[in-house]
Amino acid sequence: MTFRNCVAVDLGASSGRVMLARYERECRSLTLREIHRFKNGLHSQNGYVTWNVDSLESAIRLGLNKVCEEGIRIDSIGIDTWGVDFVLLDQQGQRVGLPVAYRDSRSNGLMAQAQQQLGKRDIYQRSGIQFLPFNTLYQLRALTEQQPELIPHIAHALLMPDYFSYRLTGKMNWEYTNATTTQLVNINSDDWDESLLAWSGANKAWFGRPTHPGNVIGHWICPQGNEIPVVAVASHDTASAVIASPLNGSRAAYLSSGTWSLMGFESQTPFTNDTALAANITNEGGAEGRYRVLKNIMGLWLLQRVLQERQINDLPALIAATQALPACRFIINPNDDRFINPEAMCSEIQAACRETAQPIPESDAELARCIFDSLALLYADVLHELAQLRGEDFSQLHIVGGGCQNTLLNQLCADACGIRVIAGPVEASTLGNIGIQLMTLDELNNVDDFRQVVSTTANLTTFTPNPDSEIAHYVAQIHSTRQTKELCA
């Protein structure tokens, strides 16, 4: 038997994990084992919302050392994280300024300023990326405007996964899939756009040319002295999750469900027409030159904040209580900017319902019901937008990531979208990370080959839409009202 041992470091906004994958070549089987799981979260530091990158690095090294202490020979390591955030370094590789998080308010108002000065259409034609107020483009503008004293000290700007790879190897890399989330990469050249960089105030010399997934960045020397290659995987966690989505045919859509919900489809070409711009669709980079045509949805961040504020520890019990409540009594727009990082999420949700003359969700279950119903309805709207954009309906939706364990939300999604939902794998980002490593090690041919492995080894659950459910009737009523308004217009 020939085995490969690959380690995936998967960092999310609320937690991180070091996972060991064992791949058996002869039977093409892949097993995962969690080595170390640790918390991540936002911190307040000197008036900014930041990440504790030192703590994250320590946790990564602890997890890697645990694998080595077991006497396991690691064949490769890969790191994926969330997008848009970065770390600045000086000529000696020391940090400059703070690792500010995208939920900080420093970039407020700058997106509108960019659209006015550069033109919304021009920015979109250059980058193909959706407009979000915390994109790196606006974060860099905030930094260079508000902290100009830092600029003379900056030599390099590394996105989060590239920073941690640098800390392990001493080598710098700018991985393509994550670089595209910045809204600074030109969609035609796959290189940094000089006009957008100039507006941001950043120096192009801070960045190296983006590289597509699959190259070896450098080597980490383990405590035993072995040199272990660190691979540039699809380092944006959603890009990795999509790689591990067992998409079957061109009519399959995906939903990467976690702190954020990312809904989209794969395409060989980007969509940057007026319809895509109006719908704020993004064309993020994927593996093998594919595009992840998708839309960001605020996701389970709202629930995470409610759980924290209400000190709820028993999520299954909450979901059971939520399921017993009637649907669609409290509806909000999860993508409203007011929910990016409010002081109190529960109060913000209640205020949104109050302002629209709805009943007010008071109990834990009512707040959860509001979030789940609102997300499912938004999923249905976005799926419809995506189908219109490409001119073809979808036949199935693959929900991957930690959020796919929420069976109530999966069923609500199936009912609201009127589409078959396949849930799993849960550890999609980790698996996609491993997939690129195995391709780099010449164990697998390509993404489609890897998806066959995932399909046969992952635990997948199918949810069939129920046209008689409350939320399905609610969606039908909305569509009927819209059609009536269009006829009367």
Swiss-Prot record:
It comes from the Bacteria. Transmembrane segments: none annotated. Substrate binds at G83, H236, D237, T238, N296. Disulfide bonds join C68-C222, C353-C370, C413-C417. InterPro entries: ATPase_NBD, FGGY_C, FGGY_N, Rhamnulokinase. ATP binds at A13, S14, S15, G16, R17, T259, Q304, G402. One of its GO terms (biological process) is glycerol metabolic process. Its cofactor is Mg(2+). Belongs to the rhamnulokinase family. Involved in the catabolism of L-rhamnose (6-deoxy-L-mannose). Catalyzes the transfer of the gamma-phosphate group from ATP to the 1-hydroxyl group of L-rhamnulose to yield L-rhamnulose 1-phosphate. This is Rhamnulokinase. The gene is rhaB.
